[in-house]
């Protein structure tokens, strides 16, 4: 086997040739291949490295040949030109980055498990844990914080209280106050009498009625918009973990500990007591009581899977 290497200031190309005249081109960054100064030509910036091995004529390794530190987009202002890449090289880069995405998601899952172990201090086994890891929903109402299941109930209570107060004020309090209209201090009833209109109209003040009806309509509309927003966000959540990203551990029944029972090897005629079973931390969930949801990969979103269209937009 004979191999030649031509070094450029940014990348090295290694050409492998075998007796079967099969050739393959591998790319390495400049830090992977440093030629000896004695091999450099004085009149050119390129270096030539040749080696021969007649006993080993194995084909070049097939698979992911992309270096770990290879990055097309290094920053917000630095983007390498990948138009010159060959088809096989593009496929290798896509496969490498897909694997990197799921490895990073697995790292996030393990970090969140450790965070849960160190942050939880006291757990009441009789009552269920609050969904603190439930992702917050952006509110559609301006100047309101993100919506959670707890704040949504508070929003319902506040809206019902406001609507009830407005109706009570417009229907009972305002008619008894004898609100005045105009500059002459004429009451609304006198104003109706002067126009020779039915006296039933004087029982309802149009100003109070319009303000009360408008306020009730605005509050009801905002509540309907918020409820619709919550329903739309719930459709985007994972159907298995309900947006938490975790499922109860089946090995320890979501308790975080499991029994450690060693096999008994004592003879039957012995008078020694049997060893009492002890508990230990569950190795499956690391004591957290929850494991990663395999459907959403700990993200809580229904589209986060291996077949996510964001990963393969042209398939």
Swiss-Prot record:
<keyword id="KW-0863">Zinc-finger</keyword>
<dbReference type="GO" id="GO:0050821">
    <property type="term" value="P:protein stabilization"/>
</dbReference>
<comment type="function">
    <text>May be associated with accumulation of carotenoids in chromoplasts.</text>
</comment>
<keyword id="KW-0862">Zinc</keyword>
<comment type="similarity">
    <text>Belongs to the orange-like family.</text>
</comment>
<keyword id="KW-0150">Chloroplast</keyword>
<dbReference type="GO" id="GO:0031969">
    <property type="term" value="C:chloroplast membrane"/>
</dbReference>
<feature type="transmembrane region" description="Helical">
    <location>
        <begin position="207"/>
        <end position="227"/>
    </location>
</feature>
<dbReference type="GO" id="GO:1904143">
    <property type="term" value="P:positive regulation of carotenoid biosynthetic process"/>
</dbReference>
<feature type="repeat" description="CXXCXGXG motif">
    <location>
        <begin position="238"/>
        <end position="245"/>
    </location>
</feature>
<feature type="zinc finger region" description="CR-type">
    <location>
        <begin position="225"/>
        <end position="307"/>
    </location>
</feature>
<feature type="repeat" description="CXXCXXXG motif">
    <location>
        <begin position="249"/>
        <end position="256"/>
    </location>
</feature>
<keyword id="KW-1133">Transmembrane helix</keyword>
<keyword id="KW-0479">Metal-binding</keyword>
<keyword id="KW-0809">Transit peptide</keyword>
<feature type="repeat" description="CXXCXXXG motif">
    <location>
        <begin position="293"/>
        <end position="300"/>
    </location>
</feature>
<protein>
    <recommendedName>
        <fullName>Protein ORANGE-LIKE, chloroplastic</fullName>
    </recommendedName>
</protein>
<keyword id="KW-0472">Membrane</keyword>
<keyword id="KW-0812">Transmembrane</keyword>
<feature type="transmembrane region" description="Helical">
    <location>
        <begin position="155"/>
        <end position="175"/>
    </location>
</feature>
<feature type="transit peptide" description="Chloroplast">
    <location>
        <begin position="1"/>
        <end position="16"/>
    </location>
</feature>
<keyword id="KW-0677">Repeat</keyword>
<dbReference type="GO" id="GO:0008270">
    <property type="term" value="F:zinc ion binding"/>
</dbReference>
<feature type="repeat" description="CXXCXGXG motif">
    <location>
        <begin position="282"/>
        <end position="289"/>
    </location>
</feature>
<comment type="subunit">
    <text>Interacts with PSY1.</text>
</comment>
<keyword id="KW-0934">Plastid</keyword>
């Amino acid at each position: 086997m004979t191999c030649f290497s031509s070094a450029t200031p940014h990348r090295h190309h290694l050409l492998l040739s075998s007796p079967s005249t099969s050739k393959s081109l591998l790319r390495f960054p400049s830090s992977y291949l440093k030629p000896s100064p004695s091999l450099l030509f004085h009149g050119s910036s390129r270096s030539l490295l040749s080696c021969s091995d007649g006993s080993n004529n194995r084909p070049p390794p097939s698979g992911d040949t992309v270096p770990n530190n290879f990055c097309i987009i290094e920053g917000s202002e630095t983007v390498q030109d990948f138009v010159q890449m060959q088809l096989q090289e593009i496929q290798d880069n896509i496969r490498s980055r897909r694997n990197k995405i799921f490895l990073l998601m697995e790292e996030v899952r393990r970090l969140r498990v450790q965070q849960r172990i160190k942050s939880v201090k006291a757990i009441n086994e009789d009552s269920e844990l609050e969904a603190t890891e439930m992702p917050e929903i952006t509110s559609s109402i301006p100047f309101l914080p993100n919506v959670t299941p707890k704040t949504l109930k508070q929003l319902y209570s506040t809206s019902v209280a406001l609507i009830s107060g407005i109706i009570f004020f417009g229907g009972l309090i305002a008619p008894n106050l004898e609100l005045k209209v105009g500059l002459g201090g004429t009451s609304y009833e006198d104003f109706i009498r002067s126009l020779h209109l039915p006296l039933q109209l004087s029982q309802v003040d149009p100003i109070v009625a319009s303000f009360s009806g408008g306020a009730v309509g605005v509050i009801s509309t905002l509540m309907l918009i918020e409820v619709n927003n919550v329903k739309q966000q719930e459709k985007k959540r994972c159907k298995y973990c309900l947006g938490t990203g975790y499922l109860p551990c089946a090995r320890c029944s979501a308790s975080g500990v499991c029994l450690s029972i060693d096999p008994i090897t004592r003879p039957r005629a012995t008078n020694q007591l049997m060893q009492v079973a002890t508990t230990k931390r569950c190795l499956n969930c690391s004591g957290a009581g929850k494991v990663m949801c395999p459907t959403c990969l700990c993200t809580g979103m229904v589209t986060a899977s291996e077949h996510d269209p964001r990963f393969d937009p042209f398939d």
